């Protein structure tokens, strides 16, 4: 309801609002449904007041009526309101309407102006000639010419009748042409008849195609705009619609989450007052009207002053005829008066539909779409535009909706990234500092969601930020929350007054809205918003002294005034995404505020290991399946490393190119294996894939090798997939292709008119792809044998029909209007000379089988070079390619799942680590023996190592050598103790002895370097050697040989040579291969060793693995500067 407050609670039911779990999307969806239902009640109330206000609504006080819409409305009144809107029984007089029983063609209803428009004789007028009579029961076919009747019969038999609109028919008596626009209703078929402006049907078709071309040009302009700017997109679409239609003013209305509207873009005649920035209450566009816009996406009112024409219908019909889908439906009197008051005589309204929520999409179809807003044209005089141009505008709106949807998704993703980053920084702040830091430092909790102020109430202390209540007021709010919402986990409202807070008046307009998250029973986080009106400004004309009834008349000014009244003492509502962000932070903070126990860390570390091992096994299974598939596939598959050199080359590529896998490996894909004309597109494809942007349906031209392959070329259509390792780092690119060499040769000949045209098109040769052609008016002029086989429709049934709507739409069904819009754009672009290559195109064949293909559309020229239409070629993906893509998606899904799990573990392990650090700090303050201090230092060193590993989980910096080292002074002996402590449990389990051959002076030797990274590297090498030492009764030895080397300025470098030795065979060969040579690791341990080797190299160290007859060992060499004084004490 426009004037209702929005108060949400988590797991709490109160008189002020509905119980709701904040952060639950399904509840958010239900909440939006409840708002819409409440809005229906408000709309019905306004409608009843208007109906009772007398003739023409002169005594109807609009602003006052909006205020009183909270009053309850009887159910019968709502039913009457909806009936009036949907079954009003009147049409606009610029056309006429006939409703027909579908089975018998018998007329069941007609508008009273139909006789005059069709030059017919009314039943009440006696006539001596054989003029046709219009009455209930007349066969509609007798009113039109024989050829028109045939068209109507064909349309009645269509599955999707609206796709054939408009049908060009002629009145039998007068010969006048009409656009017949047909749609099905519950009792039959409604035929809207709009007078056409030309006598020649061919000109009508050409005019419709010209309208589509104009729309395509506007769509191309939209698609060329830079991304990330919704305002620019809206500004462009109003300019395009105004240019197409010629209306004096065109606006974009956006519906906000609370159902109220705003003008966000406008293009107008210079002398008209601006409406940009105008906000209006939700009741200005009733929910019933919004429902109608989803059903009938284009609505034209030609003259708001025109007297509506009554519809006469068969008395046997149970209720008035449904006019929801009619292009002629008369406007409601309330809306007509509003238009007249604002000086707008004619209007055109175009619905902007985008994808809805996941919950909305469960039912599929239209239910998964959401009305985002409207594009509306106003004109100061009577104006009518023909149906083909309106149809073209609908295509433009579908393209606008697609583009807008992508921009909204991008904006949502950017917002989510911002929220996640802010949450991470806030949590990190909590781990390092005291809780008040999330308010006093930057970023603060104000950066999480849009607000005017925020506060933390922690341990009975108040930490405010921005516009907030006083400390006394916040304590009062806390007492109110505990008293009335004590069993809740949070509350959000746009009006504290409506939520029932008794002290709301004392807060004034500064604090109207509040969101609160309960961290503990005594600790709270608050966000505050001021009243909405301070943010709302309209650039329209101010109240004119002569407009004495300005507040009462229905007019944009009174709408704006009513809106300001509705939002008085109210903030902008808290959006679902904002509440999700607050709820997520609340969950994280709850855990962070609890005392962490050391045992927690053990459980989490154990869980991390278990999850990693399980994930590795699952990924290995997928990887083995991929390898088997690649080796046996009949589709060409190959791969390159990060340098673009071949590292995979399956048998199918060998067969096509004549180049063996051994010869191909190591060659540059771009420079050694591709023709020059493919190099630029391949380089771009490779560049993007190595940065995570995968390409699809790119054509490349491969060279061939061997005596029999001279001067031949292989054409492949490839998908480039980024190859990633376990850490999600990109290590190369895989290409899955389809051989289209045969089709390419045919197409080249075809486009250049080489050879026998008919023989090529209709050849049964399997190399000839499915082909269809269009003339300049998008009518099908060719449909070859392969296309007949693919679609199930014969050439005789298809040729001559319109490709957009009639063929692809009615015969070959497409998935939704968006698919038809995209196909129309491709087709018109080709006719206009802009070719499209490998466009994803899917449809249902005659038997309902779903066909997935790639569409290539090229312009079609005659011998003189003039464009006469378009050629379209269909390529079907091979089963092997489809299977490869399915396995790829499975692998990507598994990798993404592992990434989420790893991110979760990295986040959750921070709290127990913080607990370990806190426990260590407490122990330091007690009286400890020297041995206990040494144990404590070792524990602290291991904790710092684990923290750094978790914090720097991105391995890309290690791979490319850009890792930042954090150097400090430290005891070398402390590092050795920490390293040894990490393998002691494994030594005991395996029964392996550790031998330490380390000079005593090492314990007190101080050096300068990255202590934690050195510790991490040495621990990993030692752990792997212990893991593969013979057991039981085996041994592992650590030998450390330091030597001092003086350098300039009197400084000294400690040259360290450390050996980790074990008897027997030592590490498995694949582990050593992973460590030193492979860019694609096979084992989990191999990845760790490879990273440690690269970290050691970053610290100017080196490692060798040496295998002798009876033993093997790591030899690690590292130079570290020696310091003159010891390091600061640990902790």
Curated annotation (Swiss-Prot):
Alphabetized NCBIfam families for the sequence: sensory_box
Residues given in the record as phytochromobilin binding sites: 334
PTM remark: Contains one covalently linked phytochromobilin chromophore.
Domain PAS stretches: 622-693, 756-808
Biased composition (Low complexity): 14-25
Family: Belongs to the phytochrome family.
Species assigned in the record: Solanum lycopersicum
Protein name: Phytochrome B1
Region (Disordered): 1-26
């Amino acid at each position: 309801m426009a004037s209702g407050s929005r108060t949400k609670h988590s797991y709490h039911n109160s008189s002020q609002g509905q119980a709701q779990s904040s952060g639950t999307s399904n509840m958010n969806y239900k909440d939006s449904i409840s708002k819409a239902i409440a809005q229906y009640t408000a709309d019905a109330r306004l409608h009843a007041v208007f109906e009772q206000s007398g003739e023409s609504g002169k005594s109807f006080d609009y602003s006052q009526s909006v205020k009183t819409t909270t009053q309850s409305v009887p159910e019968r009144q709502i039913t009457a309101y909806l009936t009036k809107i949907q079954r009003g029984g009147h049409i606009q007089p610029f056309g006429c309407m006939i409703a027909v029983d579908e089975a018998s063609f018998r007329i069941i209803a007609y508008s009273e102006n139909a006789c005059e428009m069709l030059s017919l004789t009314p039943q009440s007028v006696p006539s001596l000639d054989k003029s046709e009579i219009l009455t209930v029961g007349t066969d509609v076919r007798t009113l039109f010419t024989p050829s028109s009747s045939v068209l109507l019969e064909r349309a009645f038999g269509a599955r999707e009748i609206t796709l054939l609109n408009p049908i060009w028919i002629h009145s039998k008596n007068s010969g006048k042409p009409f656009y017949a626009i047909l749609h099905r209703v519950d009792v039959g078929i409604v035929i809207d008849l709009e007078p056409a402006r030309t006598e020649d049907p061919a000109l009508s078709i050409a005019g419709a195609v010209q309208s589509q071309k104009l729309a395509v040009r506007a769509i191309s302009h939209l698609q060329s705009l830079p991304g990330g700017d919704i305002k620019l997109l809206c500004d462009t679409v109003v300019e395009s619609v105004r240019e197409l239609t010629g209306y004096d003013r065109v606006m974009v209305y956006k519906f906000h989450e609370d159902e109220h509207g705003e003008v966000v873009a406008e293009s107008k005649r210079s002398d008209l007052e601006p409406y940009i920035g105008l906000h209006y209450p939700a009741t200005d566009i009733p929910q019933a009207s919004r429902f109608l816009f989803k059903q009938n996406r284009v609505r034209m009112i030609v003259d708001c002053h025109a007297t509506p024409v009554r519809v006469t219908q068969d008395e046997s019909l149970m209720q008035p005829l449904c006019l929801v889908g009619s292009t002629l439906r008369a406007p409601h009197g309330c809306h007509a008066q509003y238009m007249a008051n604002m000086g707008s005589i004619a209007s055109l309204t175009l619905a902007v539909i985008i994808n809805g929520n996941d919950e909305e999409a469960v039912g599929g179809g239209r239910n998964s779409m959401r009305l985002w807003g409207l594009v509306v044209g106003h004109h100061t005089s009577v104006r009518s535009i023909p149906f083909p141009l309106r149809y073209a505008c609908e295509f433009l709106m579908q393209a606008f909706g697609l583009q807008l949807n992508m921009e909204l998704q991008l904006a949502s993703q950017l917002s989510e990234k911002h929220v996640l980053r802010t949450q991470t920084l806030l949590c990190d702040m909590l781990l390092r500092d005291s809780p008040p830091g999330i308010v006093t430092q930057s970023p603060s909790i104000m950066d999480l969601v849009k607000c005017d102020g925020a506060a933390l109430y922690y341990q009975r202390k108040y930490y405010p930020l921005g516009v907030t209540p006083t400390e006394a007021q916040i304590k009062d709010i806390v007492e109110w929350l505990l008293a009335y919402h004590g069993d809740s986990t949070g509350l959000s409202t746009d009006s504290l007054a409506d939520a029932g807070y008794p002290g709301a008046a004392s807060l004034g307009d500064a604090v109207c809205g509040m969101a609160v998250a309960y961290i503990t029973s005594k600790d709270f986080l608050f966000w505050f918003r001021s009243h909405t009106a301070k943010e709302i400004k309209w650039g329209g004309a101010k109240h004119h002294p002569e407009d004495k009834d300005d507040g009462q008349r229905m007019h944009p000014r009174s709408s704006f005034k009513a809106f300001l009244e509705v939002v008085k003492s109210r903030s902008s509502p808290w959006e679902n995404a904002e509440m999700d962000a607050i709820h997520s932070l609340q969950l994280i903070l709850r855990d962070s505020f609890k005392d962490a126990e050391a045992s927690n860390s053990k459980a989490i570390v154990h869980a991390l290991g278990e999850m990693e091992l399980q994930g590795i096994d699952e990924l290995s299974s997928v990887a083995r399946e991929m390898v088997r598939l690649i080796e046996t596939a009949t589709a060409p598959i190959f791969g390159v490393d990060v340098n673009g050199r071949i590292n995979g080359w399956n048998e199918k590529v060998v067969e096509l190119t004549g180049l063996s896998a051994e010869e191909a490996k190591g060659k540059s894909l771009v420079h050694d294996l591709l023709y020059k004309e493919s190099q630029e597109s391949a380089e771009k494809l490779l560049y993007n894939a190595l940065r995570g942007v995968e390409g699809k349906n790119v054509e490349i031209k491969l060279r061939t090798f061997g005596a029999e392959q001279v001067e031949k070329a292989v054409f492949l259509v490839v998908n480039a997939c980024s190859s990633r390792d376990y850490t999600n780092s990109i290590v190369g690119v895989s290409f899955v292709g389809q051989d289209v060499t045969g089709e390419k040769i045919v197409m080249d000949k075809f486009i250049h008119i080489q050879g026998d045209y008919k023989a090529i098109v209709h050849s049964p040769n399997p190399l000839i792809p499915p082909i269809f052609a269009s003339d300049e008016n998008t009518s099908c002029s060719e449909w070859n044998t392969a296309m007949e086989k693919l679609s199930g429709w014969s050439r005789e049934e298809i040729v001559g029909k319109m490709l957009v709507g009639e063929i692809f739409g009615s015969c070959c069904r497409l998935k939704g209007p968006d698919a038809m819009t995209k196909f129309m754009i491709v087709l018109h672009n080709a006719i206009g000379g802009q070719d499209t290559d490998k466009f994803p195109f899917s449809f249902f064949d005659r038997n309902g089988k779903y066909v997935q293909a790639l569409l290539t559309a090229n312009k079609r020229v005659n011998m003189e070079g003039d464009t006469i239409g378009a050629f379209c070629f269909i390529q079907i993906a091979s089963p092997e390619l489809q299977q490869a893509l399915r396995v790829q998606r499975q692998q990507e899904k598994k990798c993404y799942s592992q990434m989420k799990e790893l991110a979760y573990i990295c986040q959750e392990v921070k709290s127990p680590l913080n607990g370990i650090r806190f426990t260590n700090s407490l122990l330091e303050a007690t009286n400890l023996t020297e041995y206990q201090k040494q144990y404590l230092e070792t524990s602290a060193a291991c904790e710092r190592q684990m923290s750094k590993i978790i914090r720097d989980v991105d391995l890309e910096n290690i791979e490319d050598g850009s890792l930042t080292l954090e150097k400090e002074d430290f005891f070398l002996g402390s590092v050795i103790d920490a390293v040894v402590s990490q393998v002691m449990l494994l030594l005991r389990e395996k029964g392996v002895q550790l031998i330490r051959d380390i000079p005593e002076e090492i314990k007190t030797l101080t050096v300068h370097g990255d202590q934690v990274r050195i510790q991490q590297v040495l621990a990993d090498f030692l752990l792997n050697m212990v893991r593969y030492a013979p057991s039981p009764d085996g041994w592992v030895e650590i030998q450390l040989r330091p030597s001092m080397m003086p350098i300039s300025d009197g400084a000294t470098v400690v040259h360290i040579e450390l050996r980790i030795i074990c008897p027997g065979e030592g590490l498995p060969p694949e582990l050593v291969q992973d460590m030193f040579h492979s860019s694609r690791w096979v084992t989990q341990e191999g990845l760790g060793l490879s990273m440690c080797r690269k970290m050691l190299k970053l610290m100017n160290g080196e490692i060798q693995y040496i295998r002798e007859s009876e033993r093997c060992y790591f030899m690690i060499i590292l130079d570290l500067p020696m310091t003159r004084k010891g390091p600061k004490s640990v902790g």
